[in-house]
């Protein structure tokens, strides 16, 4: 009997050893669960790879690792992401963005009235909830959930193309302030896109996971999330692998778009003062906006950035340069006349038919100018930071880790403002554009049973939590 047991034990050990050795040569399993960051301005999708423990943020067909959260409706199709962005200026009334601001949210008539005036598309009130009116062959109404579903479908298709297999399960992030209705509406949008949501995770918690803080010895974590259109500041308490969102504050109308607008207003003023006309063609305004965005991105790495945009002017629109700021349209221009810009305009207009001429507007923008135009906005970032410290009954010296999330936190002056306030450098070890999607992908890997095993983030519900907004 003892001999038989010895033989059996040896056989089991042999099988285990063979399995282990074979495992070294077998291809790694394909991820089964995707992680989604459905952002207000941009959205992205990632996966956690078993074996390597690495996260891959999946690009679209053109190599973009995030896509604009925009959906355009035309007579022939519905366009999403960058295709929608290209239609934003030529088809503004049918291009929906910021849908995340409205999903599952109940508005008072006064709140909704204030929101309606901010958008070129029609925002309708349906018993306190929002619907959008768009025209594609006929006038229809679409819900924020439907707009979200089109974005999620695009992300799902990107993941399926990359993985080479169908995808049905996902983990998705939402703002910590989202109530149950907003969370369920987000899940509904995912269901419309053919996705089953295994878990909803708060964006600050996802960011903390991306930075590895779910495994680190820290207690007080401050997450500053500054994207294209919103600022969110969250104070997290970490106990073991559990996160409690202790306080939240922010500004739902402060972000990279506002910084762009300041520079755009400045450039409009330069054009008007020199030529006496304003760009009016939609495609030229679109090119100007694209150029401004590129300048902003370049200034995160360099002290100066060049821009060049070809503009068209009608002969009867040409005027002499205005002699004072009083001749400028007051509702469109900042009044700063900063010396830190070197503008070079074509001396002559190249003539075209029908009395048109073209102007090559070229200029060099300095980082100092960009910072000067936006300094008051940069300082506003500190207001919600001070608020969460007050609500959390903490001094700024008691914060163990300050982490940055969102593309706008790349701006050097913003990092400097935060560093000066806390007296120490914020944690910038993770790409701020990808922090949330990276954390969500890690959680997706955990929920999908991927190995090597990670420490899951457990979120403690805080029913008394309310976000303080400074809009």
Curated annotation (Swiss-Prot):
InterPro entries: ATPase_NBD (IPR043129), Heat_shock_70_CS (IPR018181), Hsp_70_fam (IPR013126), HSPA13 (IPR042048). Residues 315-337 are annotated as: Disordered. GO terms for cellular component: cytoplasm; cytosol; endoplasmic reticulum; nucleus; plasma membrane. It holds the Pfam family HSP70. It is found in: Microsome; Endoplasmic reticulum. Keywords: ATP-binding, Endoplasmic reticulum, Microsome, Nucleotide-binding, Signal. The keyword Cytoplasm does not apply. GO terms for biological process: chaperone cofactor-dependent protein refolding; protein refolding. GO terms for molecular function: ATP binding; ATP hydrolysis activity; ATP-dependent protein folding chaperone; heat shock protein binding; protein folding chaperone. Binds UBQLN2. Belongs to the heat shock protein 70 family. Has peptide-independent ATPase activity. This is Heat shock 70 kDa protein 13. The gene is HSPA13.
